[in-house]
Amino acid sequence: ARGRRVYREALIGLARWGGKSQVSAALGLSLMYCEPTYEGEYYVVATTKKQAGIVFDKAKRMVLADPLLRATTKVYRAVLEIPETGAIFRVLPWDADTAQGFHPQAVVIDEYHVHRDASMREAMLSGMVGTENGLLITISTAGPERKGPLWELLKTAPKDPRAHVFWVGATDDDDGHDPKVWRRANPMRWITIKMLRDQYRTLPFPVFERLHLNRFPSTGTNRAYPAGWWHAAAG
């Protein structure tokens, strides 16, 4: 319908040092300020309040650095509020039972690979049912195993017409020992080949593969990436 959001979910995958926290903060603030909703609720979710606080602190710094945003926003220790609309942006630690009472306009779930299950994400999606143009953003680095909620989401999201996948990382066909692959998995200018080479020499390869190639380690019997995920991410 006209004026309705094409995507209700987004899955973003970036390697370590890729700027995930900054991206999450910028997206959350963009939604709160550029799509004003009366008493809109905007949350950052992670496994702990400390982890979610990393993203929130980035958002708070962005607001304080901009004169216009600073003038229209009340900045508290763990909450940003726009008095004119009553909208709030805050940290929400992982607690699926408590989250049942929220009705968010937008949610950023940070480092989803650490989540034990999908209960928090499901609670947030359930709370958005009556929200027009709600958006749930899941952002993460690859997990240590090819199982769990992030792996399952990576399998289902590319097939969902209401979900958008943007996953930057190596594929199973890529040689993880090749610096050219490292560069493609880390296109950010602030990440150098020297930095990656130091990590390659220091870390066990499965750890390097996960953190710096953003690829789930190909161990065990479940070796293949979900069919079509890379094309969906690249497209």
Region annotations inferred by a language model:
Residues 118-235:
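Non-catalytic, compositionally simple segments
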Residues 55-105:
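Inter-Walker segment of RecA-like/P-loop motor cores
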Residues 5-28:
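Walker A/P-loop
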Residues 31-39:
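Post-Walker A helix-loop "phosphate-sensing" segment adjacent to the P-loop in P-loop NTPases
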Residues 18, 99, 115-116, 145-146:
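Catalytic P-loop NTPase motifs of RecA-like helicase/translocase cores
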Residues 40-59:
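Conserved Walker A/P-loop ATP-binding site and its immediately adjacent core
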Residues 110-111:
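Walker B catalytic acidic pair
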